[in-house]
Amino acid sequence: MWQPITDPKQIQRAMAGYPCWLEMDLDNLRFNLANIRSRVGVEVMPVVKNNAYGHGLVPVTRCLYDEGVRWFLVAKLYEADVIRQQFPESKVLCMDTLFGDPAYDLVVSRGISQAVFTLDMAQRLNDTAQRHNTQASVFIKVDTGLRRVGVHHETAPDFIEAVCKLPHIRLEGLFSSFMQHPDEDQNMLLRFNEVASEVERRGIEVPLRSMASTNAIFHQPEAWLDIVRPAMCLYGVHPFPNDRNVD
């Protein structure tokens, strides 16, 4: 089991030969988490991708988990696997693209929630879950205007309905990402809410809706919805200098 190195001499030996290293005060991480929680009043899904932004996936996740966090977001499947093994009661949203049967088997067998935006991916998860005699947990990514990955918002309701008809798929939620442009972000939120409303009008329950990451946590309270995804702000960093002293 992972144990932190706290002895300065041990740290010095471990970092021998390296010109620099990063140190994190976990009390500050707890402080930032508490402030975000008190601000938004909804559930949080911390972003711990890329080895928790270089701070250490397991120690950061452990600290947040001990504070009651249960949802985590990662970009790579191997990180989702590590979290599910280390913290079996946790829930992990994996953004990775899946290639090959072993990846689908791992997602289903570990109980990882997979980001889905193609019918082929949904069908393969369904077929894999059927072989495992279980259900695959999915979050559907909706493209509301960022134009990276996701189901286009105009076709999203039909897509979501088709995915939810697969017998071994369990919908955990819908999510999208902002452009971080004030005028366009309002339109993106409107599109996302329209998708969620139309899906629910069709009788499909949406357990979690998520739009807000770091910037929206500070500037768009109407986008907090059911769960927010704090990223850099958890680690004491904000992309916009004017927000450094925001309460």
Language model feature labels by segment:
Residues 2-6, 17-18, 50-55, 62, ...:
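Active-site loop/helix belt of alpha/beta enzymes
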Residues 26, 30-37, 61, 80, ...:
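Generic structural signal for well-ordered alpha-helices
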Residues 108-123, 131:
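Active-site beta->alpha loop and helix N-cap motifs at the rims of alpha/beta catalytic domains
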Residues 84-85, 103-107, 125-128, 149-153:
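Short, conserved acidic/polar surface loops in the N-terminal third of protein domains
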Residues 78, 96-100, 119-121, 232-235:
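Short, acidic/turn-prone active-site loops that include or flank metal/cofactor-
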Residues 89-98, 113-116, 135-139, 228-231:
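Short hydrophobic/aromatic-enriched beta-strand-loop microsegments
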Residues 1-113, 170:
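A charged N-terminal "starter" segment
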